[in-house]
Amino acid sequence: MSLAIWQECLAQLKDELSAGDFSTWLRPLQADFNHSTLSLYSPNKYTSEWVRNKYMATIEDKVQQLVNQENPNHSVKIRLMVGNVSSVEKKPAKQIPTQAPLTNQPWEGESKAHRVPHKSNLIKKYTFDNFVEGKSNNFAIATTQQIAENPGDVYNPLFLYAHPGLGKTHLLHAVGNAILAENPESKVVYIRSERFVQDMINSIRNNTIEQFKEYYASLDALLIDDIHFFAGKDRSQEVLFQTFNSMLDAHQQVILTSDRFPKEIEGIDERLRTRFGWGLSIPIDPPELETRVAILITKAEERGLKLPDDVAFFIAKRLTITDVRVLEGAIANISAKAQFTGQGITISLVQDALRDMLAVHTKQTTIDNIQKIVAQHYRIKISDMSSKRRTRTVARPRQIAMALAKELTQHSLPEIGEAFGGRDHTTVLHACRKVQELRRENNDIQEDYKILIRTLSM
């Protein structure tokens, strides 16, 4: 038996699955045949679990059928694990011409791309070590860490999308810093979209546009923040499109971020949006309670403060935000209040320090407001939230509203059930679990949920 069997299995799966599913879950797998065992290696635990639950049975059937065509009645064992094929050597680092020393000079439009000094623009303090991990962002973290280990090999391009303030920029810097830590000679550049556009305009004025394109195409990794800024800028999109193609063809890593899913970015050429979808698109969700607590404690420690657990939970339960910078602002206010008064950090001090912030937040997250916003979003009547109607067009929005009420308010399950037509707390619990399941399996539901949280947090 040989790896040709696995390649044929992949070819069949590629024909049966959507391009996105195949590229996301199966293409990254590495394989190794040893006697009667096919070992499959996934880049991270999340991918491994997804493949095991969704595709493993199909893979086993196809591999066995292919083996039987060559050797009837011969059985094959398939193992799935996290890691790399032991015999696969690490890709050698790209050789950087000696004429290209790393400097802190910005783009100047020199005549030859390989002689253009570059500035990474990376902020060294942003690393994986100080990025607080939780359920809302663990897939994004695992994926970017895998990319840092093998840039250009898997998940290329990577598209991260999230509401502002949820860590997209931090992760871009973290993966760039990790790549440079592994190979200091790598040419890695982080750049905001508006700076890219401005540099391109300057190169046109200076008649150095070809050198500009060559320079970006010569990088080992390009990290572009806020890609939605390119909307409506046709010439910039054309240059980005050419750069994109050149880098992907050369297996050079591209990571992009935006505040919305690629297909939702208006004013972007369809060719570019298609390219964005070639790799993996990952959302970063608003942090859940436990992650908010961890963020608060971490940010307090960075300021030399000891934030008691009960105080951290008190703040986290009342600031169910979609922007981590709000939590950072809360810690700054608490720190200033504690220093000014000389008091210890207690719930009483926090209530005083965050009085205005907590008042605004409480106003935004009432059950009535949630019902109103969800009803408007799904174009149903507010009265449907408490009615006995069970049609999907009504029941699904009602379940989503219940889940939002549990996440965004301090009401108990019985209180939430009462607000939704006197329903039992078990009905609310079922709704929350159902919505959580749907968000994992249905991109439309996931996007709706994120939009609703964003709206309710404004």
Curated annotation (Swiss-Prot):
<dbReference type="InterPro" id="IPR010921">
    <property type="entry name" value="Trp_repressor/repl_initiator"/>
</dbReference>
<keyword id="KW-0235">DNA replication</keyword>
<dbReference type="GO" id="GO:0008289">
    <property type="term" value="F:lipid binding"/>
</dbReference>
<dbReference type="GO" id="GO:0005524">
    <property type="term" value="F:ATP binding"/>
</dbReference>
<dbReference type="InterPro" id="IPR013317">
    <property type="entry name" value="DnaA_dom"/>
</dbReference>
<feature type="binding site">
    <location>
        <position position="168"/>
    </location>
    <ligand>
        <name>ATP</name>
    </ligand>
</feature>
<feature type="region of interest" description="Domain IV, binds dsDNA">
    <location>
        <begin position="339"/>
        <end position="458"/>
    </location>
</feature>
<feature type="region of interest" description="Domain II">
    <location>
        <begin position="79"/>
        <end position="120"/>
    </location>
</feature>
<keyword id="KW-0238">DNA-binding</keyword>
<keyword id="KW-0446">Lipid-binding</keyword>
<feature type="region of interest" description="Domain I, interacts with DnaA modulators">
    <location>
        <begin position="1"/>
        <end position="79"/>
    </location>
</feature>
<dbReference type="InterPro" id="IPR018312">
    <property type="entry name" value="Chromosome_initiator_DnaA_CS"/>
</dbReference>
<feature type="region of interest" description="Disordered">
    <location>
        <begin position="92"/>
        <end position="114"/>
    </location>
</feature>
<feature type="binding site">
    <location>
        <position position="169"/>
    </location>
    <ligand>
        <name>ATP</name>
    </ligand>
</feature>
<protein>
    <recommendedName>
        <fullName>Chromosomal replication initiator protein DnaA</fullName>
    </recommendedName>
</protein>
<dbReference type="GO" id="GO:0003688">
    <property type="term" value="F:DNA replication origin binding"/>
</dbReference>
<dbReference type="InterPro" id="IPR020591">
    <property type="entry name" value="Chromosome_initiator_DnaA-like"/>
</dbReference>
<dbReference type="GO" id="GO:0006270">
    <property type="term" value="P:DNA replication initiation"/>
</dbReference>
<keyword id="KW-0067">ATP-binding</keyword>
<keyword id="KW-0547">Nucleotide-binding</keyword>
<dbReference type="GO" id="GO:0005886">
    <property type="term" value="C:plasma membrane"/>
</dbReference>
<dbReference type="Pfam" id="PF08299">
    <property type="entry name" value="Bac_DnaA_C"/>
</dbReference>
<feature type="binding site">
    <location>
        <position position="167"/>
    </location>
    <ligand>
        <name>ATP</name>
    </ligand>
</feature>
<dbReference type="InterPro" id="IPR013159">
    <property type="entry name" value="DnaA_C"/>
</dbReference>
<dbReference type="InterPro" id="IPR027417">
    <property type="entry name" value="P-loop_NTPase"/>
</dbReference>
<dbReference type="GO" id="GO:0006275">
    <property type="term" value="P:regulation of DNA replication"/>
</dbReference>
<dbReference type="InterPro" id="IPR038454">
    <property type="entry name" value="DnaA_N_sf"/>
</dbReference>
<feature type="region of interest" description="Domain III, AAA+ region">
    <location>
        <begin position="121"/>
        <end position="338"/>
    </location>
</feature>
<comment type="subunit">
    <text>Oligomerizes as a right-handed, spiral filament on DNA at oriC.</text>
</comment>
<dbReference type="GO" id="GO:0005737">
    <property type="term" value="C:cytoplasm"/>
</dbReference>
<dbReference type="Pfam" id="PF00308">
    <property type="entry name" value="Bac_DnaA"/>
</dbReference>
<dbReference type="InterPro" id="IPR003593">
    <property type="entry name" value="AAA+_ATPase"/>
</dbReference>
<dbReference type="GO" id="GO:0016887">
    <property type="term" value="F:ATP hydrolysis activity"/>
</dbReference>
<comment type="similarity">
    <text>Belongs to the DnaA family.</text>
</comment>
<comment type="function">
    <text>Plays an essential role in the initiation and regulation of chromosomal replication. ATP-DnaA binds to the origin of replication (oriC) to initiate formation of the DNA replication initiation complex once per cell cycle. Binds the DnaA box (a 9 base pair repeat at the origin) and separates the double-stranded (ds)DNA. Forms a right-handed helical filament on oriC DNA; dsDNA binds to the exterior of the filament while single-stranded (ss)DNA is stabiized in the filament's interior.</text>
</comment>
<dbReference type="Pfam" id="PF11638">
    <property type="entry name" value="DnaA_N"/>
</dbReference>
<keyword id="KW-0963">Cytoplasm</keyword>
<feature type="binding site">
    <location>
        <position position="165"/>
    </location>
    <ligand>
        <name>ATP</name>
    </ligand>
</feature>
<feature type="compositionally biased region" description="Polar residues">
    <location>
        <begin position="96"/>
        <end position="106"/>
    </location>
</feature>
<dbReference type="InterPro" id="IPR024633">
    <property type="entry name" value="DnaA_N_dom"/>
</dbReference>
<dbReference type="InterPro" id="IPR001957">
    <property type="entry name" value="Chromosome_initiator_DnaA"/>
</dbReference>
